Amino acid sequence: MAAPILKDVVAYVEVWSSNGTENYSKTFTTQLVDMGAKVSKTFNKQVTHVIFKDGYQSTWDKAQKRGVKLVSVLWVEKCRTAGAHIDESLFPAANTNEHLPSLIKKKRKCMQPKDFNFKTPENDKRFQKKFEKMAKELQRQKTSLDGGVPILLFESNGSLIYSPTIEINSSHHSAMENRLQEMKEKRENLSPTSSQMIQQSHDNPSNSLCEAPLNISHDTLCSGESFAGGLHSSFDDLCGNSGCGNQERKLGGSINDIKSDMCISSLVLKANNTHSSPSFTHLDKSSPQKFLSNLSKEEINLQRNIAGKIVTPDQKQAAGMSQETFEEKYRLSPTLSSTKGHLLIHSRPRSSSVKRKRVSHGSHSPPKEKCKRKRSIRRSIMPRLQLCRSEGSLQHVAGPALQALSCGESSYDDYFSPDNLKERNSENLPPESQLPSSPAQFSCRSLSKKERTSIFEMSDFSCVGKKTRTVDIISFTAKTISSPQKTGNGEGLATLSCVTSEESSAPEEALRCCRQAGKEDACPEGNGFSYTIEDPVLPKGHDGDLTPLEGNLEEVKEAVGLKSTQNKGTTSKISNSSEGEAQSEHEPCFIGDCNMETSTEEKENLPGGYSGSVKNRPTRHDVLDDSCDGFKDLIKPHEELKKSERGKKPTRTLVMTSMPSEKQNVIIQVVDKLKGFSIAPDVCETTTHVLSGKPLRTLNVLLGIARGCWVLSYDWVLWSLELGHWISEEPFELSNHFPAAPLCRSECHLSAGPYRGTLFADQPVMFVSPASSPPVAKLCELVHLCGGRVSQVPRQASIVIGPYSGKKKATVKYLSEKWVLDSITQHKVCASENYLLSQ
């Protein structure tokens, strides 16, 4: 670096090319700095030398006016080469444009790119001032007693985090802190999760399993996502393989089954919490081993008495094998079976019913067929729709026909999948499985989807009720409904209708299955597709076991909206008058079908003959139509609710006023996160909240006051963001600046209909001048919202608001617009003398 020969020089450099497009000031600035001179970026009072060449005329004039030395670039070069401070008078600057007329102002534009200099407080004055201001503010916040300002952090993923350090309202904040601390301390008293319930079930499997599902909240049970994973997973994953099943898997699968049942029939669950059937209570009290042995004895006795056929030991062994197969496959303990009896009163214990079905099949089929069936069921849990039973087969039904274990939607789809087509085609019932007394039946090969459709299309519904006595099954998306019958020997059997639906079934699929059920009902030969399952006989004297259900059935009737004229509908064919009386006496109602309890008078008036009993009841096809209508009525509100929730926008709007753009962006993000509001530019009928960045009396604030809205500060949004929900508005209301806001809001909440203030109700008719400010429309809206009357013409008005240029009357008051604005702000009519306009 050269010697500081120009240390006393403060220079301002303005060196341009002759055509005014190139700026060469930087080169000479560097040379001057090297020689110890101080170079100023602006032409201020400290400047002593101006290095000038083809610069601005204003710079030349200013230098001459101040008496600053004007030198050329040659002076700088001479000083550098000589190494000394040369006399400025030897190298005066020349202004070539001084004597030219300035008719056209030539705009200089440097074509050279500017060097990017990172702004720091040292090289940028504005940045330095801003930095000093922030430092002072930070120091003030540290020393003040109120604490610091809230901090907003924007993370890399775009999420917004609020870290408040200031207490808006100390009492409000402390109460909130105490509440959060209390919730943390009481966390162990919250509802147990499903995993905790499974752990509890290990300690006390007989009691806790019955109680744990009932402790779950109703909302959790009935949500569409609660147990979707359990329903759609395979049975092997839930229950394990047949060889290695431990107690934990048994309990897990059983609990999932119980939960799904509770979700399925939520209407009945409410009543089941207070009512329980005595018949199921006595089943629950008995031990599991005794219960199973009783079932086997009852079945053997029934087969001996009714069919006249003694069961051989081989058949007993086959029945035992089928029971073991079912236990290994489904992992349902007898205790859990009786538990289901408590949870769903209108549903038999499924494990026992399906075991009985297995026993009945096993007594007439060889072990090879059972092995095949075991393999096929491992792939498809859905029970096959067996082809027609004979008249004699119905006589084997010792109790009400009951539906088999219902499975999830995935099982239903799996049955019709191409993977199982081969198995279903090869699955034949052997001739030995048919009873000797049964008449000719269909081929027992399972039908494919195309064959089923073709048979449904050719079906003749005229033969309904003529010949068959089998119990038909109506499928509502894997719902199998069976209506029990009372046998001819006069045993007092409690009849029960079973509805078991899967947890989540699409309404469209349900309606489609309802239509398929209507087609599937009958066939040209008069034999319907049916599935007859034997059920354990309840002891005599239990005819009244269904009385707790009657109240529940009335609730279900109201929910489905079915008419009393449909009470005669039934899902089973009536064989004789005794069966018809038993059917009408005990026939229950269930969701998705139109069966209603027949009154005692109708039961007594039923004819004794079979033909009369059939005449009094509608055909099967009519019942199916009514069932479909009832099911449509049931699912229609849920569909409409989902659509309305999906397409519905928030009805409340939020308006921002006097808000900087940074805060507006924050509010938009918070509203998008917490929902519940839509942002509007101006106050309208749906506006409930007005957010003001500064306590200024804007038009939106006045309209918000007139409409009874919350007028809040920006901090309400920040605190709501911190707590994750919209909090109470009262601590953040700007009532000090706008005293009318809480008063109008209270009046709005107390008003029955649409709110309209009474501030100007006693004032005469007003006319708003077109030249008024705020605009006429907004001012008229304010007057109208506060109960005033506005005229379109001045001759009908006694008060004129705003500047009026027409002929003035002595009887009319000419007031300023501030009279309206101040009256609304203070919530009282201000004295008009202070707002009179000059005549």
Curated annotation (Swiss-Prot):
Q: Where is the composition biased (Basic residues)?
A: 343-361
Compositional bias segments (type: Polar residues): 564-581
Q: Which residues form the signal peptide?
A: none
Q: Where is this region: Disordered?
A: 337-376, 417-442, 564-586
Q: Which GO terms describe its cellular component?
A: centrosome; cytoplasm
Would the keyword Repeat be found if you checked this record's keyword annotation? Answer: yes
Pfam families documented for this protein: Microcephalin (PF12258), PTCB-BRCT (PF12738)
Principal subcellular localization: cytoplasm
Q: List keywords of the entry alphabetically.
A: Cytoplasm, Cytoskeleton, Phosphoprotein, Repeat
Give a GO biological-process term: mitotic cell cycle
Q: What is known of its domains?
A: BRCT domain 1 is required to prevent abnormal chromosome condensation. It binds directly to the SWI-SNF chromatin remodeling complex.
**Oligomer status and interactors:** Interacts with CDC27 and maybe other components of the APC/C complex. Interacts with histone variant H2AX under DNA damage conditions.
- What does this gene product do? Implicated in chromosome condensation and DNA damage induced cellular responses. May play a role in neurogenesis and regulation of the size of the cerebral cortex.
The name of this protein is Microcephalin
Organism field = Pongo pygmaeus (Bornean orangutan)
